[in-house]
Every structure is written in structure tokens, then in C-alpha cells.
């Protein structure tokens, strides 16, 4: 093994630099980018070639810098890296790692650092020192083979010893997965996720079905899985590779919001990804049709229609260019959504087919009802709001839409007040915890996230469905612009026949993050032409247009309307709540954002920094989400003596940090888009204690931190459905592609 030693001369121009090996313990992480995996770390190199141990004892004085795609290497982890030395004009000598693998450290200091890094649950820095002091270089052998001896260490009882042993065993399995993935650039956290998904079958899946990694493990893309597949000998034109490429192209379309693709476009995208001729791709599509992984439907003569029904359109074997291809879950979800909405909307007329609310309100004198709302509850509704109330209580399915400040919540209060006065069971929900909490505050009634309401479980299973529907006569869902096809289908399946469904939302907001622009599609189907009800709509739509909230003096409301109408926003003059500050460069814009949050807005308006949310259109760049989070954390919540920290997935968390959940975690019952604040760090257990904005408190184990990120700055899409006292948004020329209406 080549230790660091004196750095070799940098190879001259045109020469291939000699590959070297470097082994040591990561002492600290100087920089890391979780999105790209690029990191800069300081390494204490090991000498394992018989040289005196005294040289190793001086390692603190001869740390070396390692740069490269290092995933989420944590302080204390031992790594073996291959690469070469380079003399950077600005930063000096660095080891550029082209690949690496993590190993167990062999030195006493390395063992202490490793055990105390949070990788082993139940062991913090203090207990790590005690364990290694007790067992010395035999520490890992003791934990591995005689974990019962851990109770010999002061402060460690049987319960903690058992927890340490269990975590160590799991880490051993993860290291075995890492060994199978050596040279493929897979980080430790990804290996842990692979093991969590496949367990003892991980090595078999990697060796025989590597493309499953891309489909079933969050954070592993097709290119990584393809690299592994090619390394184990899967041919470029192998059927499994071609089919995996087609599925990846459809999954990419879903990430962009599309539930299906025309076949020619699908083939073209797959060819570009796989670098193969289109002939083989057509066979791959047919094979996926036969297996049921995808579903085909003919392209209608007009605009694309819905996918086939859940019973399935027979796979088309002709080569008509208009064939549409969808991943089976999306095709079935859209078909199921359409069929269930038709069934719910069909509960009209009289008798048993009529809903409970319709039976009650069909004979109501609405002038009396609205007068009662005004006199008894001080709810004085505008005519368009009255139309929304009538629709919600007489039609089985109705939509209520409008921009910010147009009185949607006020109209909803009228609906709920009348419904509850007649004894109807009302259930309220929204897609995110923050939106549900805001709904609850506005209506003074309980509201839940859709995930909790529907009792969603891993794999898309739901506790509430046609066989176990919601106990409700009226189901109200706010922020429906955030509904994707899969979630909307689960929702309508849980609405009992005979209940009313009221969908509330702003069609001018961004579409859902997931595939399927449900609200926009429903509005197109309803063919609503204005604020009043369209007589031919299959379900009534009320669009509120008059602004009631944030009145004439509000620059926010006025500029929102101007932008929506394609007009330039106006700043200055009497407008005192909407400002524009110019910046020459992205770096200057980023510094202006930080100064606004940390100093200027608190000083002028009295906002606390925690009440100010930074939104960025893009993740990358000097004024992107990632860079702004780093700058804002350093300014608002920097490292300081006595403040505990926990590192995970390339990020460092401290009490007071704002955080955001990136994907659904059914074990912790936290979901994509949930926002919160770190309350505390338990270094011994390797846990974060987070207070979510919806009032719940969650303990995050270190293994779950890969799905958490900082939220001093978030993307505009992630903030959908939320409201904040103050918002700062950098808008740069580099964001131009994302700044359309």
C-alpha cells in the first residue's frame, strides 16, 4: 500500500499521471456537495509497510487533502483511494481520487474517530474513547466476536451493548455491499440503502439484476446501475439493458410531470440514453408490454387523451406512430381516477343515488341560508362565493379555484358552517403538513395530510380505499394543484359513494411535483369559461376572481395579477411590501439575499430570520438552493463551541437549522415537502430531534438523513402550498428558462 509520504513530481503536459494508492482516516470534511458527490477532505494517511509507528503518531501534523467524487465519507471513516497527486496553483498539493472504498481504520486514533462519528448507533465520542482505551487494537474484533465484553467499559450497560452490537452487524453487511460495489463510486449511505432494500440478497441483486438498483433504491440513477451492469459483463444490446433504458426514460418523463410519452419520443430518448439503434428499442417496448410493466394506448386524433382503463387496452402490435406508452402504475392511476370521478359525479337525481348533502340542501332556500351565515356567523359572501357554496353542497364533485386573496378559504368556511349545521361529517385534508396546518387554522376544524388521512404505506398501499372508505359526507381537499395522478387516485378511491368531494386550489400555481397535472386536467374537462358555473360541465367549477385579501395597497397581490396577465410588475412608489433589488452577478445576488435575511428585513420590518423563507428557482449555481443554504447556515447558525453537530449525507446539522424532507419515509411518517427545525442533536445515538411545522416532533436516525436537507433556502416547487411572513427570491438571467408564467 502506498502511503502519502513526500508528494511525487506533478507529471508534465501530455504525460499520463501515475496512479497511486492512498489509505488513511478522514479527519474532517472541508467541503462537500451532496448533489454531485464532490468533496474535499483532510486525510490522516496510514503507513502499513513496516515503518515505525512514530510516523503515524505524527499524522496530525501531516494531513493531506483529498478531492474527488467521494460521496458522503464521514469523519472517522478509513478509505483506500486510487488516483494521482496534483499541485493546484491555489490550494497546493492534493490527491485527486478517481475511485475509493471505505475500510475499517487500523490505528487506535482512527478507531476512536470512526466509532465516535455517529456511524455506530449508541456510540458517541466519549464512549468511543472509553471502548478503544479498554480494548486497544482489538476493539473491532471484540465488537465483532465478543460484543458481550462491551459491558466491561464504564458507562455501557447490557442494553447499550446490545444496540452497539446490532448496529455493528448491520454495518458489517453494509461493508460487504460496499466490497461488491468497489470501484463503482457508490457511497456508504447508498450501500446502506441498498442493504436496507434487499437485505442479505444485496450481493445477488448487484451481480444478477443491477438495473433494479436504479428502479428500487432512491439516489441510484440509471447511469450508475448501467456502469455496474457493464462491469459485470452485460452487453450493450442485452434485452435487460434495453428494457431498463426504456423504463428509465419513462421514469424521467414522470419526474418532469408527464404520465406517458408518444412512442417515437420514447424510442428517441431511450436511444440517446443507451447509445443504440432504434430497432432493438421497439422489441424492448413490446417485451415490457407483454410483462405488464408498461401499457399502450392509441393516440387520438385530437389532443392526447387519458391513458387506457385499468382493465387495460390490448397491447397494439401495429406500428402506428401514434401509440402512447405509460408506466403501468400511472396508466392505472389515471384510468382509475377518471372512472371513480365519473362514478362519484353520477350520484345525482333523487332517491338512493342522491348524496346525503344533496338530499338535505336540494330544498334549501339559499337566500335564507346565506342570510343566516351573515347574521349568525358574520360570513357575508360575494355572489361568486355563494355559487361555490351551492355547488359544494348540491353537486357530488365540485371544484373551487382562484388566485391568492380571492376568498377561497372564506367560501370554504361557508360550506363547512352550513354542512356541520345539518349534521354532515366533514373531513379536511391537504397534500402537505404545512398546508394542512394552515387549513386547520383558517377553518378551526381538524385537517390532516393526505398521506395520514389515507393511511398510506410503503409501496403505495393505503389503509383507506373502496373497501374501507373515509367516514365522511363531505371531503374537502385544499391545494389540489399539488395533487399528482397517483395520490389523486388514492384519494378518490377512499371517498365513499354518496359523499361530496370538494377540490380547492389555484390553477395558476406550479403543477404537482409528481406526474400528472390533475387540477389543470379536471378544469379542462369541466370546460369552465369564467367565474360562474358552466352548464355543460360534468361537475361544477367556480373560479373566484375578485381580490378580497391583501387589498389595493398590496404590491404582492397586484404584481401577482400583473405577472399572471403577462404584464411587467411594478415596484416602488406607494407599494411597501414588494421590492426589487438589482445585482450585477450571481455572487452579489447571493450575498444580498443573505444580508436581507440576516440584517435588513429584521431591522426594517421586525421579522425574525426564521420567519423569512428564501426561494430559488434552481438548485445549482452561486444563487441556487445548495449554495444559499451553505451561506445562510454559516451566517444564521454557524458552528460554535458547545453547539452539538451531527453529520449525515454530506451535510452538517445543528440545533436551530431549518430542514426539509425530500422523500416519503413511511417508517418515520414524514413526507416529501415537510418542513421543520432541528431542536437537538444526540451525538451518542446519532439522532436529530426535529420539530415539524405541523406540530409533530420526529427523531431522525443517522440512516434516514439522506432524505433530509437544509431549508434556509428551498426551491420554488418545494414551497408550493406554503405561506411565509416574508419571502426573498433571487431571479437571475441564468434562471431564464424557469421564469415563464
Regions inferred by a protein language model and the residue ranges of each:
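ASCE P-loop NTPase helicase motor core
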Residues: 260, 386-389, 395-572
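Accessory, non-ATPase domains that flank or precede helicase/AAA+ motor cores in DNA-metabolism machines
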Residues: 2-304, 309-365
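Conserved helicase motor core of P-loop NTPases
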Residues: 499, 507-668, 679
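Conserved pre-motif I regulatory segment
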Residues: 365-397
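Short glycine-/polar-rich loops that comprise or flank the Walker A/P-loop
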Residues: 76-81, 423-424, 472, 497-500, ...
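Residue-level signature of catalytic and energy-coupling elements of molecular machines
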Residues: 24, 124, 157, 221, ...
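Conserved nucleotide-binding/hydrolysis modules and their immediate coupling elements
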Residues: 20-29, 34-88, 96-100, 271-274, ...
Amino acid at each position: 500500500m502506498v502511503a502519502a509520504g513526500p508528494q511525487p513530481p506533478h507529471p508534465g503536459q501530455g504525460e499520463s499521471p501515475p496512479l497511486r494508492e492512498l489509505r488513511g482516516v478522514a479527519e474532517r470534511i472541508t467541503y462537500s456537495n451532496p448533489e454531485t458527490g464532490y468533496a474535499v477532505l483532510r486525510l490522516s494517511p496510514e503507513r502499513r509497510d513496516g515503518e515505525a509507528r512514530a510516523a503515524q503518531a505524527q499524522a496530525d501534523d501531516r494531513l493531506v487533502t483529498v478531492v474527488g467524487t467521494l460521496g458522503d465519507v464521514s469523519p472517522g471513516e478509513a478509505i483506500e483511494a486510487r488516483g494521482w497527486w496534483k499541485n493546484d496553483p491555489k490550494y497546493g498539493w492534493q490527491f485527486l481520487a478517481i475511485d475509493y472504498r471505505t475500510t475499517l481504520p487500523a490505528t487506535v486514533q482512527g478507531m476512536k474517530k470512526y466509532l465516535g462519528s455517529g456511524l455506530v448507533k449508541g456510540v458517541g465520542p466519549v464512549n468511543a474513547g472509553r471502548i478503544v482505551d479498554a480494548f486497544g487494537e482489538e476493539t473491532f474484533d471484540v465488537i465483532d466476536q465478543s460484543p458481550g465484553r462491551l459491558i466491561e467499559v464504564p458507562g455501557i450497560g447490557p442494553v447499550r451493548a446490545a444496540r452497539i452490537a446490532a448496529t455493528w452487524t448491520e454495518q458489517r453487511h453494509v461493508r460487504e455491499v460496499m466490497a461488491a460495489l468497489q470501484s463503482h463510486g457508490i457511497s456508504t449511505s447508498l450501500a446502506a440503502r441498498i442493504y436496507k432494500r434487499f437485505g442479505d440478497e444485496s450481493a445477488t441483486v448487484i451481480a444478477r439484476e443491477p438495473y433494479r438498483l436504479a428502479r428500487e433504491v432512491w439516489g441510484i440513477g440509471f447511469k450508475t446501475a448501467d456502469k455496474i451492469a457493464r462491469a459485470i459483463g452485460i452487453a450493450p444490446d442485452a434485452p435487460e439493458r434495453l428494457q431498463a433504458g426504456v423504463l428509465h426514460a419513462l421514469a424521467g418523463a414522470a419526474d418532469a410531470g408527464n404520465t406517458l410519452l408518444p412512442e417515437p419520443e420514447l424510442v428517441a430518448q431511450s436511444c440517446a440514453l443507451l447509445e443504440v439503434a432504434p430497432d432493438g428499442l421497439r422489441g424492448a417496448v413490446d417485451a415490457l408490454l407483454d410483462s405488464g410493466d408498461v401499457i399502450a394506448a392509441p393516440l387520438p386524433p385530437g389532443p392526447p387523451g387519458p391513458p387506457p382503463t385499468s382493465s387495460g387496452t390490448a397491447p397494439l402490435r401495429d406500428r402506428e406512430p401514434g401509440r402512447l406508452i405509460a408506466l403501468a402504475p400511472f396508466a392505472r392511476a389515471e384510468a382509475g381516477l377518471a372512472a371513480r370521478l365519473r362514478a362519484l359525479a353520477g350520484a345525482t337525481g333523487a332517491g338512493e343515488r342522491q348524496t346525503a348533502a344533496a338530499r338535505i340542501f336540494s330544498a334549501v332556500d339559499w337566500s335564507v341560508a346565506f342570510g343566516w351565515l351573515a347574521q349568525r356567523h358574520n360570513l357575508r359572501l360575494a355572489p361568486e362565493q355563494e355559487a361555490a357554496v351551492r355547488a359544494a353542497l348540491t353537486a357530488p364533485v365540485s371544484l373551487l379555484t382562484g388566485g391568492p386573496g380571492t376568498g377561497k378559504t372564506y367560501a370554504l368556511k361557508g360550506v363547512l358552517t352550513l354542512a356541520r349545521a345539518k349534521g354532515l361529517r366533514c373531513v379536511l385534508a391537504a397534500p402537505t403538513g404545512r398546508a394542512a396546518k394552515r387549513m386547520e387554522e383558517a377553518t378551526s376544524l381538524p385537517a390532516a395530510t393526505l398521506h395520514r388521512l389515507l393511511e398510506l404505506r410503503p409501496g403505495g398501499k393505503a389503509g383507506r380505499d373502496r373497501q374501507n372508505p373515509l367516514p365522511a359526507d363531505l371531503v374537502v381537499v385544499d391545494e389540489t394543484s399539488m395533487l399528482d395522478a397517483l395520490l389523486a387516485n388514492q384519494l378518490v378511491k377512499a371517498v365513499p359513494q354518496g359523499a361530496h368531494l370538494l377540490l380547492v386550489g389555484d390553477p395558476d400555481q406550479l403543477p404537482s411535483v409528481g406526474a400528472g397535472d390533475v387540477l389543470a386536467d379536471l378544469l379542462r374537462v369541466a370546460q369552465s369559461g369564467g367565474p360562474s358555473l358552466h352548464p355543460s360541465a360534468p361537475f361544477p367549477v367556480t373560479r373566484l376572481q375578485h381580490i378580497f385579501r391583501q387589498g389595493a395597497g398590496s404590491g404582492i397581490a397586484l404584481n401577482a395579477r400583473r405577472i399572471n396577465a403577462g404584464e411587467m410588475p411594478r415596484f416602488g412608489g406607494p407599494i411597501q411590501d414588494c421590492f426589487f433589488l438589482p445585482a450585477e452577478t450571481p455572487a452579489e445576488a447571493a450575498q444580498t439575499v443573505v444580508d436581507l435575511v440576516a440584517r435588513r428585513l429584521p431591522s426594517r420590518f421586525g421579522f425574525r430570520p426564521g420567519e423569512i423563507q428564501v426561494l430559488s428557482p434552481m438548485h445549482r449555481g452561486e444563487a441556487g438552493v445548495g449554495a444559499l443554504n451553505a451561506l445562510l447556515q454559516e451566517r444564521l447558525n454557524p458552528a460554535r463551541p458547545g453547539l452539538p453537530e451531527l453529520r449525515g449525507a454530506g451535510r452538517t446539522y445543528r440545533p436551530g437549522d431549518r430542514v426539509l424532507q425530500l422523500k416519503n419515509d413511511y417508517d418515520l411518517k414524514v413526507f416529501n415537502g415537510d418542513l421543520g427545525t432541528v431542536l437537538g442533536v444526540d451525538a451518542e445515538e446519532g439522532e436529530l430531534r426535529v420539530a415539524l411545522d405541523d406540530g409533530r416532533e420526529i427523531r431522525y436516525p443517522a440512516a434516514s438523513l439522506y432524505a433530509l436537507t437544509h431549508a434556509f433556502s428551498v426551491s420554488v416547487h418545494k414551497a408550493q402550498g406554503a405561506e411565509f411572513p416574508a419571502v426573498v427570491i433571487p431571479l437571475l438571467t441564468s434562471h431564464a428558462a424557469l421564469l415563464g408564467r
